């Protein structure tokens, strides 16, 4: 557990990882050790179609989870990977289930449904609009940049979905498979919570967007009327994104930047922010609806 720049306690959390129980290269015990050593407080082990209950491994807290993937490898026919996190019991699902059935069953079991790596899956805003109850989506997925498609970043999906009125909490996850230093301990969320909080409280904090997604930097976004402010750890770039294809004050570059401000334009529907540090590591804010 760490405290942010405002003294708020936060947990370092990864919500997407695989083990030898499906297609990962480490056992659950080895995977937990890797993340424990990297300072993580909570992880969800999300093997494909293999539900793992909540608990603890080697002192690392485990949220229940599984990844339900459907559609094979051809995005033209629809590919959906949905994480079921924090379920109180095993969802009653078969691999014939469609994406909406998966979401509904995860909710029936008191979990949250996260749309995984939409850029990697080539998911569209139209596909997302057909799904009811998606609780969050990944804006970054580490393994998707490692030899499969090089589509780790889902910002374009997030923005086009927001243009259609679809707003999601944005998480960053590893989706660890190889554990080779490229896809492990590279992206996470910093969740406003305490390690003594219940699973239900952690899930509620995620749904209420009480976190930021990051590869290292800290980021906070605030709105005061038509003024949007980002406060962050020292970075070299602060960028604002919205439905406006062009607007002033959206790109800020420099050394040791810790703050940037932009003003909302009358036609804007949403604004979010990203920061990039000197090492190229990014952090992503929540989406502010206007």
Where are these regions (language model features)?
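C-terminal functional module detector
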Residues: 1-6, 10, 165, 169, ...
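Short loop/turn and capping residues at structural boundaries
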Residues: 46, 117, 172, 216-217
